Design a protein with these regions (language model features):
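C-terminal lobe/tail of nucleotide-utilizing enzymes
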Residues: 1-33, 85, 205, 236-349
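Nucleotide-state-sensitive switch-loop elements of NTP-binding domains
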Residues: 13-39, 47, 52-230
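Aromatic side chains
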Residues: 40-41, 111, 164, 251, ...
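P-loop (Walker A) phosphate-binding loop of NTP-binding proteins
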Residues: 44
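Conserved phosphate-coordination/catalytic loops
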Residues: 144-147, 230-233, 259, 301-302
Length: 349
């Protein structure tokens, strides 16, 4: 990776890629981008988070780290940036890079099928049809796909340190992503309630069997429904612990020097702070290069300067990295490698 000289050779003379040095108590952006096992890229739609997530994943793979790049955005574009077709399961991209685009519909169908299988084991035959109908109704209810997506999301998080050294997430636009990241706290409470009620049901069953004797039938030595709930509670607890561990996870916000992305990103950083999810850096994308000339560029540069000052003020607690507006779209592995080199020049050693 190129030296951290604070300038982007060949992409705009004098561009201050390291917009501010990280505060003393902030994590090193170099360590975050190069080594953090769980890395989440997020931002307002259209700011370039997918491209930057892919560039970091390619750089990680080229450095010899087994890396999984995951898109949780329903409007997938990771495959477009990589110029390969992707599906709901990992596909090989490079010797150390795999990528997938989570399909919420497929995940919801798979999730519901698993629920039906577990419920069928403990449902009396006379109730089976009605129970299955109720499950099918739940499949099309609001939040079903989001819950299934989160279930897959937590499973993929556990791949970091097991199947892969790093998992890089290209997340959906901020509103959707913040709801997803808030789910561990919300679902923990919900599952605790379900487990409590399930245990009460099991107590009543045992009491009934003791009273009814052999006529009540043999008691099951296990309860697949309770086992599934306990497994999910444990997995969601691990997800919450991982998300809030600054040595394991970091969220990288991508913002452009424009008013609306700045405001939305500031609100998002406050929400993550509330949930104790560490912010590793803020990347300011598409900064106008100093080499750009002409009346339009001058007017744009004047307006951008005000936005950059605003960014420095609003995100003073975080490392701020700048990426210049490039002369053409980033497409394919070679372009992503060049972008990773540009970003690398901003990383303090």
């Amino acid at each position: 990776m190129a030296p951290a000289d604070g300038h982007a050779a060949g992409t705009g003379r004098g561009l201050p890629l390291l917009l501010t040095a990280p505060p003393a108590d902030a994590p090193s952006p170099r360590e975050v981008l190069q080594h953090r096992p769980l890395l989440f890229f997020g931002g307002k739609g259209g700011v370039g988070k997918t491209t930057l997530a892919a560039a970091v994943a390619v750089g990680s793979a080229d450095a010899g780290r087994r890396t999984l790049l995951v898109s949780t955005d329903p409007a997938h574009s990771v495959g477009d940036v990589l110029r390969i077709g992707l599906g709901n399961e990992p596909s090989g991209v490079l010797p150390n890079l795999w990528a997938l685009e989570i399909d919420p519909t497929e995940e919801a169908d798979r999730y519901i099928a698993g629920v039906k299988e577990r419920i069928a084991e403990v449902t009396p035959p006379r109730l089976a049809a009605e129970v299955e109908r109720q499950i099918d109704v739940a499949r099309v209810s609001p939040g079903a796909e989001e819950a299934a997506l989160f279930d897959r999301f937590t499973r993929l998080m556990e791949e970091a340190g097991t199947g892969y050294e790093r998992v890089v997430f290209d997340t959906a636009p901020l509103g959707h992503t913040l709801r997803l990241l808030a789910l561990p706290e919300q679902l923990q409470q919900w599952i605790r309630g379900l487990i409590g009620r399930r245990r009460q049901v099991n107590v009543m069953r045992r009491m009934w069997r003791n009273v009814a004797g052999a006529a009540a039938g043999e008691a099951r030595p296990d309860d697949p429904v309770l086992e599934a709930l306990e497994e999910r509670r444990a997995r969601f607890a691990r997800a919450r612990d991982a998300l809030t561990d600054p040595t394991r996870a970091a969220f990288v916000f991508v913002v452009t020097p424009e008013r609306l992305p700045i405001l939305e990103t500031e609100r998002a950083t406050r929400i993550l702070e509330r949930y104790r999810i560490p912010v590793g850096a803020v990347v300011v994308n598409r900064v106008l290069p100093a080499a750009a000339e002409g009346p339009f560029a001058e007017r744009r540069r004047d307006e951008e300067a005000g936005h950059l000052d605003d960014i420095r003020r609003r995100f003073a607690a975080h490392a701020l990295l700048g990426v210049p507006q490039l002369p053409r779209d980033v497409q394919g592995l070679d372009d992503l490698r060049r972008l990773w080199e540009v970003l690398g020049r901003a990383l303090p050693r």
